[in-house]
Curated annotation (Swiss-Prot):
Keyword field: Cell inner membrane, Cell membrane, Membrane, Transmembrane, Transmembrane helix, Transport
Record flagged with keyword Cell inner membrane: yes
GO molecular function, one term: xenobiotic transmembrane transporter activity
Description of how the protein assembles with itself and partners: Part of a tripartite efflux system composed of MdtA, MdtB and MdtC. MdtB forms a heteromultimer with MdtC.
Gene designation per UniProt: mdtB
The species this protein was found in: Citrobacter koseri (strain ATCC BAA-895 / CDC 4225-83 / SGSC4696)
Annotated protein name in UniProt: Multidrug resistance protein MdtB
Sequence similarity: Belongs to the resistance-nodulation-cell division (RND) (TC 2.A.6) family. MdtB subfamily.
Compartment annotation: Cell inner membrane
Transmembrane parts of this sequence: 25-45, 342-362, 369-389, 396-416, 440-460, 472-492, 537-557, 863-883, 888-908, 911-931, 967-987, 998-1018
Domain of life: Bacteria
Membrane topology: Multi-pass membrane protein
GO cellular component: plasma membrane
C-alpha cells in the first residue's frame, strides 16, 4: 500500500488530486460551458467601441451656403449645444443642404441621445424657414463610418426615376427595418417628380410672372380634409378631384385668362416627368445607377446586420421587374470574416507549436498530453465568460487567446516539471503529485496574479482606446485565471494517474539525443553563470545599459496610432476647380473612372456627383473603389493607392485623394485623407486670412503628403444688388425678388402629389437651355404695385463675386479642416510634431485655435498616456508581488528584468520597420508580465532553499537557476511560439496582428538571454543591501 504524505501536503491541489472523478467532471463542465458559449458569441472586426453619434440632415433646395448656415444650421446648433453628454458638434452647410453631426460621450446610451436630439429639433422648429420643404431628419449613424454594404441598381429598359421609385418603396424601406441598420441612402438623385420648366419669354409676352404660375399650380393641387355628411340614416364622406396626378393634367392646367381665352401651363412651360434634383448622379462602374449605401448604427454588429440583409435580398429582388438588376458591389463583412478566419488559423497554429515545444522538452507522450489538455480547456472555457460579458469573437479577442496559448501552458509546464522531478527521484506518482503541487502552488499563484496585475491598467484606460482594449485585457485575464485553476486541479491529478518512473525513463533515440543536448546546455549555462556571479558589477552595468538603451529607443522609434488595415475598400474624393458645374464634374468623373477600372487590382467602382448632404459641393465627387480579394491581387492597398493616384494624375483638371477604409472609425466627418487638423476662428474673414498661410507651410513639410483643405472661398456668385429705393417706389419687396429668383433657379418644390404608396414633388424652374449662364438673369420679371411687369434689371445690378462653397462649424464656430496622409518613410508621430513646430512659426493670433481631430487626436491622447500606463502596470505588479512575498526588496529584483524586454521589443519593431502603435504598446505591457516569471521561478526556489535547507544566498540562487533553467526555457519558448504566428501573419488583417507578434517575439528573445544572468546578480546585490541595512539599523529592522 502506498504511503501518502501528510494531509498538509498538496496545498489547494490535494482535494482535486484525491478526487479524480469530481475534478474530471468539473473540467468537463468548464469545457461544455465554453463550447455552448462559443455558439452564442457574435463575430465582429473589433470590439464595439463606437461613440454614440447622430447625424441631422436638412435639405433646402436653392439656398446658398450662407443662407443654410444662418437660417438652418445656426438655430439647430444653438439647441443642440444645450444637450448634456455632447462631446463634439460639427456641421457643414453647403448649397441646399445642412448636415450637423453630434458625437456624444461613450457613457451616454444612444437611445437617450436620440431623445435629446429629437427634443432639440422640436425646440428649433419655430426658428427655421417657413418654406422649408421638409423638417430636419436625424439618423443614428456616423457619416464617417464607411457603409457596411453597397448595392447598385441598374436597368437597361427603365428610366432611373422609375427604378429609384421601386427601390425606395420595395427595397430600401425593408432594409432600413433590419436591426442594426442606421441609414440607407440612395445616391443618384433620381427621385420621380413633375418638372415645370417655364419659358421666360412666353410668360413675359403674356404679362405673367413666375410667381403667378407658382400660385396657380399651388392652389390647383391640394389634398386636404373636406368633411362628411351625417344624415338620418346614412353618413357620406366628401371627396373631390382636387389632386392632379399626371403630367398631362399639369399641362392642361389653366394658369390665367387672356382676352377671354385660357392660358394653360403647357403654353408657357415644358412639363415633363423627371428627377426631383437634376444635379445629382451616381454610377456603378461605367453605368448610371441608383447606389444604395447601408450604414450601421453605432455599436451594431456588422456581421449579423449584413447577414440579415443578405437573407432578405432574394425576396426583395423578386419584387422588382426582370429588367432591374441589383448587384452587391461591396460587403465589409467579407474581409472581416477573412480576417477572423486567419486569426483563428493562427490560434490553432500557436496551439500546435506550443504542444510541439512541450514534447521537445518533456520527450514523453503522457507528459505532453497533460499540458496539451490544459491549453484548449483554458481557451474554450474563456468563451463562457465572454458570452456573460457581451464580448464578441473579433481580431483583438482572438489575438488575446493566441497570446494566451503561450501563457496558459506555462502554469501546467511548471507543475509537470516539478512533479516529474520527484518521480525521477523515486517518489510514487501520487506522492510526487501531492508534494510537487504543494511546493509549486505559491509560484503558480504568484505568476498568475502578477501577470493579471499588468493587465489592470488597461481596464482603466480612458476614451475609445480603453474601450477598445478592455475586451482584449479581460479575455486574456480570464484565460490566465482558468489556466491557473486547471494547473492546480486537473494537471496534478493527471500527473498522479498518467506519469510513472517507467514512462519518464522510457526513451527513444530522439529523446536520448535531446536529453544530452539539454544537459550540455545546462552545463554550459552553469559555467557561464558562475563567471557572471564573479563579476557582479559588470553584469549590473549591462542591466543599467539596457535600461538606458530602452529609454533611447523609446524616444527615437517612429510612433503611430493604429495600423493601417487592408480591408479591400478605398474611399476617394475627386476635386475639380471651384467653379465646376454638375455636367463638367460628371464628365471628369467618367474620365477618372475609366482610368481606375483599368487597374488589375480593382474589381468595381461607384461614383457620386452632386450636393445631397454627403457631398459638400458640385466641384467634388465621392468614389468607392472595391478591390479584388487579397489572394487575387499582387499588391496591398497602399501600393494600389499610389498606383491609382499616379495614373489619375494624367487626367487634367482634377485632384484625387484616396484612403483605405478602416474598421476603427473615430472621425465624424468624411475627409479626403486619413488624418485631420483643424483651424478654428470666430469669423470666416479670419479663416480666409490664415488658412492660405498655414496651407502653404503644411504643403512644404516632407512629413506630410496629399495635404488639402476643405476651405473653398472661390465659388462663383451672381450677387443681385437691388436698388431698394427704386424697388420700393414700384411696390416691389425683397421677398418678391427672392421668390422670383427662387422660382427661376432654385429647383423649387412648389407642390406635392400624394399617392397610396409615396409622395412626389412638383418642381418649378426656368428653362435655361436657350439662355444659359448669367444671361438667364435678364429674363426675370416682377410685378409692380400697379400690376405692371418690371424686369429685374430695372431695379438691380448683377455683380459677379466669390463666396465659400460650404461653411463648416465645430462647436458653433467657423472651422477649416486640413487633411493629410503620412509618407511611407515617416510616422504619424513625425507628422504631428512637424505640424506643431510649423504652427509655432506661423504666429497665429490668440483668437484662432488649432486642434487635431479623429484618429490624430486619439493618437495624441494615447501617446500621452502610454508612459503612465506602463508605470501603472509596473506599480500594480510591484504591489502584488510585495504582498505575495511580504517584502519590499524581492519585487524590485523581479522587476529588474523589464528593461531587457523593452529593448528587445523596440529593436524588433525598428528592424521590422514597424511603428510603435497602440497594438505594439499592448505587446510591451504583456511582456512586462511575461518576462518577470523567469525571476519569480528563480527567486521562489532560492528563498525556499535558504529557508528550508539553510543554503547561502549565492549557492541558493545558483542552484535555483540550474533547477529552473529547463522550465524557464520551456515557458519562454511556449510564449514565443504563441506569438510567432502573429508575427509571421500575411493574410487579411495581418497589419493589425503583426506589431503585437513582432514586439513580443523580440522582447522574449532578448529578455530570455539576459535575465538568466542579470536576475541572480541583482538578487545577490539586494541580499547584500539587506544585510547592510540590518547591520546599520538593527533596532528599526527588528521593530519592523
Amino acid at each position: 500500500m502506498q504511503v501518502l504524505p501528510p494531509s498538509s501536503t498538496g496545498g489547494p491541489s490535494r482535494l482535486f488530486i484525491m478526487r479524480p472523478v469530481a475534478t474530471t467532471l468539473l473540467m468537463v463542465a468548464i469545457l461544455l460551458a465554453g463550447i455552448i458559449g462559443y455558439r452564442f458569441l457574435p463575430v465582429a472586426a473589433l470590439p464595439e467601441v463606437d461613440y454614440p453619434t447622430i447625424q441631422v440632415v436638412t435639405l433646402y433646395p436653392g439656398a446658398s451656403p450662407d443662407v443654410m448656415t444662418s437660417a438652418v444650421t445656426a438655430p439647430l446648433e444653438r439647441q443642440f449645444g444645450q444637450m448634456s453628454g455632447l462631446k463634439q458638434m460639427s456641421s457643414q452647410s453647403s448649397g441646399g443642404a445642412s448636415v450637423v453631426t453630434l458625437q456624444f460621450q461613450l457613457t451616454l446610451p444612444l437611445d437617450v441621445a436620440e431623445q435629446e436630439v429629437q427634443a432639440a429639433i422640436n425646440a428649433a422648429t419655430n426658428l427655421l424657414p417657413s418654406d422649408l420643404p421638409n423638417p430636419p431628419v436625424y439618423s443614428k449613424v456616423n457619416p464617417a463610418d464607411p457603409p457596411i454594404m453597397t448595392l447598385a441598381v441598374t436597368s437597361t429598359a427603365m428610366p432611373m426615376t422609375q427604378v429609384e421609385d421601386m427601390v425606395e418603396t420595395r427595397v430600401a424601406q425593408k432594409i432600413s427595418q433590419v436591426s442594426g441598420v442606421g441609414l440607407v441612402t440612395l445616391s443618384g438623385g433620381q427621385r420621380p417628380a413633375v418638372r415645370v420648366k417655364l419659358n421666360a419669354q412666353a410668360i413675359a409676352a403674356l404679362g405673367l410672372t413666375s410667381e403667378t404660375v407658382r400660385a396657380a399650380i399651388t392652389s390647383a393641387n391640394v389634398n386636404s380634409a373636406k368633411g362628411s355628411l351625417d344624415g338620418p340614416t346614412r353618413a357620406v364622406t366628401l371627396s373631390a378631384n382636387d389632386q392632379m396626378q399626371s403630367v398631362d393634367e399639369y399641362r392642361q392646367l389653366i394658369i390665367a385668362w387672356q382676352n377671354g381665352a385660357p392660358v394653360r401651363l403647357g403654353d408657357v412651360a415644358t412639363v415633363e416627368q423627371g428627377a426631383e434634383n437634376s444635379w445629382l448622379g451616381a454610377w456603378a462602374n461605367k453605368e448610371q445607377a441608383i447606389v444604395m449605401n447601408v450604414q450601421r448604427q453605432p455599436g451594431a454588429n456588422i456581421i449579423s446586420t449584413a447577414d440579415s440583409i443578405r437573407q432578405m435580398l432574394p425576396q426583395l429582388t423578386e419584387s422588382l421587374p426582370k429588367s432591374v438588376n441589383v448587384t452587391v458591389l461591396s460587403d465589409r463583412t467579407t474581409n472581416i470574416r477573412a480576417s477572423v478566419t486567419d486569426t483563428q488559423f493562427e490560434l490553432m497554429l500557436a496551439i500546435a507549436l506550443v504542444v510541439m515545444i512541450i514534447y521537445l522538452f518533456l520527450r514523453n507522450v503522457p507528459a505532453t498530453i497533460i499540458p496539451g489538455v490544459a491549453v484548449p480547456l483554458s481557451l474554450i472555457g474563456t468563451f463562457a465568460v465572454m458570452v456573460f460579458l457581451d464580448f464578441s469573437i473579433n481580431n483583438l479577442t482572438l489575438m488575446a487567446l493566441t497570446i494566451a496559448t503561450g501563457f496558459v501552458v506555462d502554469d501546467a509546464i511548471v507543475v509537470i516539471e516539478n512533479i516529474s522531478r520527484y518521480i525521477e527521484k523515486g517518489e510514487k506518482p501520487l506522492a510526487a503529485a501531492l508534494k510537487g503541487a504543494g511546493e509549486i502552488g505559491f509560484t503558480i499563484i504568484s505568476l498568475t496574479f502578477s501577470l493579471i496585475a499588468v493587465l489592470i491598467p488597461l481596464l482603466f484606460m480612458g476614451d475609445i482606446v480603453g474601450r477598445l482594449f478592455r475586451e482584449f485585457a479581460v479575455t486574456l485575464a480570464v484565460a490566465i485565471l482558468i489556466s491557473a485553476v486547471v494547473s492546480l486541479t486537473l494537471t496534478p491529478m493527471m500527473c498522479a494517474r498518467m506519469l510513472s518512473q517507467a514512462s519518464l525513463r522510457k526513451q527513444n533515440r530522439f529523446s536520448r539525443a535531446a536529453e544530452k543536448m539539454f544537459d550540455r546546455v545546462i552545463e554550459k549555462y552553469g559555467q557561464w553563470l558562475a563567471k557572471v556571479l564573479n563579476h557582479p558589477w559588470l553584469t549590473l552595468s549591462v542591466a543599467l545599459g539596457t535600461l538606458l538603451l530602452s529609454i533611447m529607443l523609446w524616444v527615437f522609434i517612429p510612433k503611430g496610432f493604429f495600423p493601417v488595415q487592408d480591408n479591400g475598400i478605398i474611399q476617394g474624393t475627386l476635386q475639380a476647380p471651384q467653379s465646376s458645374s454638375f455636367a463638367s464634374m460628371a464628365q471628369r468623373q467618367r474620365q477618372v473612372s475609366d482610368v481606375i477600372l483599368k487597374d488589375p487590382a480593382v474589381e468595381s467602382l461607384t461614383a457620386f456627383v452632386g450636393v445631397d448632404g454627403t457631398n459638400p459641393a458640385l466641384n467634388s465627387a465621392r468614389l468607392q473603389i472595391n478591390l479584388k480579394p487579397l489572394n487575387e491581387r499582387d499588391d496591398r492597398v497602399q501600393k494600389v493607392i499610389a498606383r491609382l493616384q499616379h495614373a489619375v494624375a494624367k487626367v487634367p483638371g482634377v485632384d484625387l485623394y484616396l484612403q483605405p477604409t478602416q474598421d476603427l472609425t473615430i472621425d465624424t466627418q468624411v475627409s479626403r485623407t486619413q488624418y485631420q487638423f483643424t483651424l478654428q476662428a470666430t469669423s470666416l474673414d479670419a479663416l480666409s486670412t490664415w488658412v492660405p498661410q498655414l496651407m502653404e507651410k503644411l504643403q512644404q513639410l516632407p512629413q506630410l503628403s496629399d495635404v488639402s483643405s476643405d476651405w473653398q472661398d472661390k465659388g462663383l456668385v451672381a450677387y443681385v444688388n437691388v436698388d431698394r429705393d427704386s424697388a420700393s417706389r414700384l411696390g416691389i419687396s425683397m421677398a418678391d425678388v427672392d421668390n422670383a429668383l427662387y422660382n427661376a433657379f432654385g429647383q423649387r418644390l412648389i407642390s406635392t402629389i400624394y399617392t397610396q404608396a409615396n409622395q412626389y414633388r412638383v418642381v418649378l424652374e426656368h428653362n435655361t437651355d436657350t439662355t444659359p449662364g448669367l444671361a438667364a438673369m435678364d429674363t426675370i420679371r416682377l410685378t409692380s404695385s400697379d400690376g405692371g411687369i418690371v424686369p429685374l434689371s430695372a431695379i438691380a445690378k448683377i455683380e459677379q463675386r466669390f463666396a465659400p462653397l460650404s461653411i463648416n462649424h465645430l462647436d458653433q464656430f467657423p472651422v477649416t479642416t486640413f487633411s493629410f496622409n503620412v509618407p511611407d518613410n515617416y510616422s504619424l508621430g513625425d507628422a504631428v510634431q512637424a505640424i506643431l513646430d510649423t504652427e509655432k512659426t506661423v504666429n497665429l493670433p490668440v483668437d484662432i485655435t488649432t486642434q487635431f481631430q479623429g484618429s490624430t487626436l486619439a493618437f495624441q491622447a494615447a501617446l500621452g498616456s502610454t508612459v503612465w500606463l506602463i508605470v501603472a502596470a509596473v506599480v500594480a505588479m510591484y504591489i502584488v508581488l510585495g504582498v505575495l512575498y511580504e517584502s519590499f526588496i524581492h519585487p524590485i529584483t523581479i522587476l529588474s528584468t523589464l528593461p531587457t524586454a523593452g529593448v528587445g521589443a523596440l529593436l524588433a519593431l525598428m528592424i521590422a520597420g514597424s511603428e510603435l502603435d497602440v497594438i505594439a504598446i499592448i505587446g510591451i505591457i504583456l511582456l512586462i508580465g511575461i518576462v518577470k516569471k523567469n525571476a519569480i521561478m528563480m527567486i521562489d526556489f532560492a528563498l525556499a532553499a535558504e529557508r528550508e535547507q539553510g543554503m547561502a544566498p549565492r549557492d541558493a540562487i545558483f542552484q535555483a537557476c540550474l533547477l529552473r533553467f529547463r522550465p524557464i526555457l520551456m515557458t519562454t519558448l511556449a510564449a514565443l511560439l504563441g506569438a510567432l504566428p502573429l508575427m509571421l501573419s500575411t493574410g487579411t488583417g495581418a497589419e493589425l496582428r503583426r506589431p503585437l507578434g513582432i514586439g513580443m517575439v523580440g522582447g522574449l528573445l532578448v529578455s530570455q538571454v539576459l535575465t538568466l544572468f542579470t536576475t541572480p546578480v541583482i538578487y545577490l546585490l539586494f541580499d547584500r543591501l539587506s544585510l547592510y541595512v540590518k547591520s546599520r539599523f538593527p533596532r528599526q529592522e527588528e521593530e519592523a
